[in-house]
């Protein structure tokens, strides 16, 4: 999925911002969260997040649900590199495995399982 954030901000600017964030808040992860383009789910009001590294993927999903005011019976799926990350995984481990070369972690969300492949949970 193509990131609008990447389209709107040049690489050097994104990289410098991510580095500044990581220096100032070493226990936080810079995340860009965007809606999958053709999804019928609500658009989020804020793309940029500074996430505690010990937050789980499931807790991050909860934050996103609240931001888009998604009712409990509606489904939401989040994707990292077009794959569903395990809900119990720590955001720090997802960041280390999937961060972009600019230093941000790009997450997309959808009301449907667009890509449909789950990451294997490491035991």
Curated annotation (Swiss-Prot):
One of the Pfam families matching this protein, by short name: ATG8
Lipidation (Phosphatidylethanolamine amidated glycine): 116
Keyword Repeat: no
Gene Ontology BP, a term: autophagosome maturation
Propiece span(s): 117-123
CDD domains: Ubl_ATG8
Chief subcellular location: membrane
InterPro entries: Atg8-like, Ubiquitin-like_domsf
Site label Cleavage, positions: 116-117
GO MF assignments: phosphatidylethanolamine binding
Keywords, alphabetical: Autophagy, Cytoplasmic vesicle, Lipoprotein, Membrane, Protein transport, Transport, Ubl conjugation pathway, Vacuole
Family: Belongs to the ATG8 family.
Biological function: Ubiquitin-like modifier involved in autophagosome formation. With atg4, mediates the delivery of the autophagosomes to the vacuole via the microtubule cytoskeleton. Required for selective autophagic degradation of the nucleus (nucleophagy) as well as for mitophagy which contributes to regulate mitochondrial quantity and quality by eliminating the mitochondria to a basal level to fulfill cellular energy requirements and preventing excess ROS production. Participates also in membrane fusion events that take place in the early secretory pathway.
Name of this chain's protein: Autophagy-related protein 8
Species for this entry: Sclerotinia sclerotiorum (strain ATCC 18683 / 1980 / Ss-1)
